[in-house]
Amino acid sequence: MARVKRGVTAHAKHKKVLEQAKGFYGRRKNTIRTAKAAVDKAGQYAYRDRKVRKRAFRSLWIQRINAGARVEGFTYSQFIHGLDVAGIVIDRKVLSDIAGQDPVAFKAIADKVRAALAA
């Protein structure tokens, strides 16, 4: 059986890693050993931070809802409880957008919450 030389395969693998490392600083962009480590670490950060981004946006939405709710005389938790009691099903992303972009609509929602909590 003939000997298989891996020059083409190895070159392709190295090229793939170096393309992923494009834009990195120093030897990380052009030395295969450091580039491979840097690309692996970048992948770990990317995986982790895709989860963190979801948390961060939810936190931002809650802050915006809280600000809008306090203008209407509620705390965030009172407002969310009131939405539940009133039977209003709306997610935090949309609610924060309403609070920031359309104060009149948010006031209407707050009035329904106030009525539901009073009843």
UniProtKB/Swiss-Prot annotation:
Keyword field: Ribonucleoprotein, Ribosomal protein, RNA-binding, rRNA-binding
Database matches in Gene3D superfamilies: 6.10.160.10, Ribosomal protein L20
Keyword Kinase: no
GO molecular-function terms, A-Z: rRNA binding; structural constituent of ribosome
Superkingdom field: Bacteria
One Pfam entry name: Ribosomal_L20
PROSITE patterns with a match to the protein in the record: RIBOSOMAL_L20
One term under GO cellular component: ribosome
One BP term from GO: translation
InterPro entries in the cross-refs: Ribosomal_bL20, RIBOSOMAL_L20_CS, Ribosomal_protein_bL20_C
Family label: Belongs to the bacterial ribosomal protein bL20 family.
Purpose: Binds directly to 23S ribosomal RNA and is necessary for the in vitro assembly process of the 50S ribosomal subunit. It is not involved in the protein synthesizing functions of that subunit.
Name of the featured protein: Large ribosomal subunit protein bL20
Lineage of origin: Bacteria, Pseudomonadati, Pseudomonadota, Alphaproteobacteria, Caulobacterales
